[in-house]
């Protein structure tokens, strides 16, 4: 509908957040355009846990991190784990992720490569984690068609094999952050193992990337304490996954 990339700085508490969404007016008719928005992703996370009576952080811990045994993943890094918490770098200066409204729901997870490998494995093989199987399949279903790719719940999905140039071009912020016309799939197309499934993530001091092909049972997680261009992440990952898929 046209929500902004981030929740406006003036929205600083829960009451103001609900007021912001209540008075917000869509720029386009629902289901016609796709525009990347942490304000939208964060709202989805907030609403997903609303009836549980738990905070997003507690729900994540109980329903996702514990079943996957992701013991080094946090919203707020505890004192005992601070020694392992990397500094990010932006313009040569050390920094950490800054908090804000919906940071937990949209971009606030801190994790390790080992824990992300567990998350990656669960998404490649949902049968390996029965407690999360349905949620994983739901997240990888195809809800919108955007040109040559599909929108899952967070995930961006291409049919495999895919030309690296397509994914690289679409991941550039000059393209990824612009609005695009979409086709709503009704009903949503079910999860297809013959897919390239991926998601980039960035804050000022950090850059991350996850991509996998369930059919090939291969995937990659890239975590860096520097923000660097999405196309470079995609290009490297595609080369690695393509090579692994041949063996």
Question: What are the language-model segments listed below?
Answer:
Residues 18-26, 45, 49, 121:
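Amphipathic, well-packed alpha-helical segments that form the structural scaffold of globular domains
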Residues 3-14, 71-73, 211-213, 220-221:
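A short, well-structured edge-of-sheet supersecondary motif
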Residues 4-8, 29-33, 45-50, 104-107, ...:
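Second-shell loop/turn segments in exported
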Residues 1-38, 54, 62, 79-100, ...:
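Active-site-proximal loop and beta-strand segments within enzyme catalytic domains
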Residues 40-45, 117:
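Well-ordered alpha-helical segments within folded domains of soluble proteins
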Residues 49-54, 58-62, 66, 96-247:
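Catalytic loop of the DD-peptidase/beta-lactamase superfamily, centered on the K-T-G motif
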Residues 26-40, 104-107, 209, 217:
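Short active-site loop at a secondary-structure junction
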């Amino acid at each position: 509908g046209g929500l902004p990339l981030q929740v406006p700085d003036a929205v600083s508490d829960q009451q103001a957040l609900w007021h912001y969404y209540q008075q917000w007016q869509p720029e386009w008719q629902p289901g016609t355009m796709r525009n990347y928005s942490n304000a939208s992703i964060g709202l989805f996370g907030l609403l997903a846990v609303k009836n549980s009576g738990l905070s997003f952080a507690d729900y994540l811990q109980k329903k996702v991190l514990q079943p996957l045994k992701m013991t080094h993943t946090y919203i707020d890094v505890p004192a005992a784990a601070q020694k392992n918490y990397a500094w990010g770098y932006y313009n040569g200066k050390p920094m950490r992720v800054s908090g804000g409204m919906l940071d937990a729901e949209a971009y606030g997870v801190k994790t390790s490569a080992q824990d992300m490998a567990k998350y990656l494995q669960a998404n490649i093989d949902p049968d390996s984690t029965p407690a999360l199987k349905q949620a994983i399949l739901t997240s990888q279903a195809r809800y919108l068609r955007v040109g040559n790719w599909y929108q899952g719940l967070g995930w961006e999905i291409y049919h495999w094999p895919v030309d690296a140039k397509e994914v690289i071009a679409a991941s550039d912020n000059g393209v990824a952050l612009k609005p695009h016309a979409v086709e709503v799939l009704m009903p949503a197309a079910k999860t297809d193992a013959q897919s390239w499934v991926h998601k980039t993530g960035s804050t000022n001091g950090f850059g991350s990337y996850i991509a996998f092909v369930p059919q090939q049972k291969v995937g990659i997680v890239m975590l860096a304490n520097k923000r660097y261009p999405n196309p470079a992440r995609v290009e490297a990952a595609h080369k690695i996954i393509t090579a692994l898929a041949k063996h």
